[in-house]
């Protein structure tokens, strides 16, 4: 092996060792993605819902394109309700488990419970309706005005 290759390998190893002591940032979006995967029995990743229809993703408005999009509309409303309670739903982390019957919340504070419930209801909603690929990165945004 060439010395340059050894240096690169050493650099990668040192980086990984250093990063292992840094805890990952617990972001609600990451948790929501795992809840989605749990609810649909790991058939579809959570990021497939990040830019779906008119409501899945940031800034939802207009007429939902299908039932999955209506799930996102309801999730947006749930987050609005959480904000009215003084919660910060996009930043609130919570404890949950992925059980045989899907995800469920096991958390302590009022905001954690409320936000986790918003996410579990949305994840279960997604799992109960067919996913239509034509609405992923939906191009007919006129309908979303």
Curated annotation (Swiss-Prot):
InterPro entries: PLipase_A2, PLipase_A2_Asp_AS, PLipase_A2_dom, PLipase_A2_dom_sf, PLipase_A2_His_AS. It is found in: Secreted. It is an enzyme of class 3 (hydrolase). Binds 1 Ca(2+) ion. GO terms for biological process: arachidonate secretion; lipid catabolic process; phospholipid metabolic process. CDD domains: PLA2c. Expressed by the venom gland. It catalyses: a 1,2-diacyl-sn-glycero-3-phosphocholine + H2O = a 1-acyl-sn-glycero-3-phosphocholine + a fatty acid + H(+). Its EC number is 3.1.1.4. Residues 20-27 form a propeptide. One of its GO terms (cellular component) is extracellular region. SUPFAM superfamilies: Phospholipase A2, PLA2. Residues 1-19 form the signal peptide. The active site is at residues 75, 119. Keywords: Calcium, Disulfide bond, Hydrolase, Lipid degradation, Lipid metabolism, Metal-binding, Neurotoxin, Presynaptic neurotoxin, Secreted, Signal, Toxin. Disulfide bonds join 38-98, 54-144, 56-72, 71-125, 78-118, 87-111, 105-116. GO terms for molecular function: calcium ion binding; calcium-dependent phospholipase A2 activity; phospholipid binding; toxin activity. Coiled coil: none annotated. Its cofactor is Ca(2+). Snake venom oligomeric phospholipase A2 that has potent presynaptic neurotoxicity. Chain A possesses a very low toxicity, but is essential for neurotoxicity. Possesses a low enzymatic activity. PLA2 catalyzes the calcium-dependent hydrolysis of the 2-acyl groups in 3-sn-phosphoglycerides. Heterohexamer. 2 forms exist: 2 A or 2 B chains, 2 C chains and 2 covalently-linked D chains, and 1 A or 1 B, 1 C, 2 covalently-linked D chains and 2 differentially glycosylated covalently-linked D chains. Textilotoxin was originally described as pentameric. Belongs to the phospholipase A2 family. Group I subfamily. D49 sub-subfamily. This is Basic phospholipase A2 textilotoxin A chain. It comes from Pseudonaja textilis (Eastern brown snake).
């Amino acid at each position: 092996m060439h010395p340059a290759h050894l240096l690169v390998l050493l650099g990668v190893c040192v980086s990984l060792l250093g990063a292992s002591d840094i805890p990952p940032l617990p972001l609600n979006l990451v948790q929501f993605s795992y809840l989605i995967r749990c609810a649909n029995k790991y058939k579809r990743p959570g990021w497939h819902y990040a830019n779906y229809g008119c409501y899945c993703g940031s800034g939802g408005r207009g007429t939902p394109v299908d039932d999955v999009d209506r799930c996102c509309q309801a999730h947006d409303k749930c987050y609005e309700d959480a904000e009215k309670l003084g919660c910060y739903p996009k930043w609130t982390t919570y404890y949950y488990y992925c059980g045989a019957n899907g995800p469920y919340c096991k958390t302590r504070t009022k905001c954690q419970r409320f936000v986790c419930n918003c996410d579990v209801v949305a994840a279960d909603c997604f799992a109960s309706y067919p996913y239509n690929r034509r609405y992923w990165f939906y191009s007919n945004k006129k309908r979303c005005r």
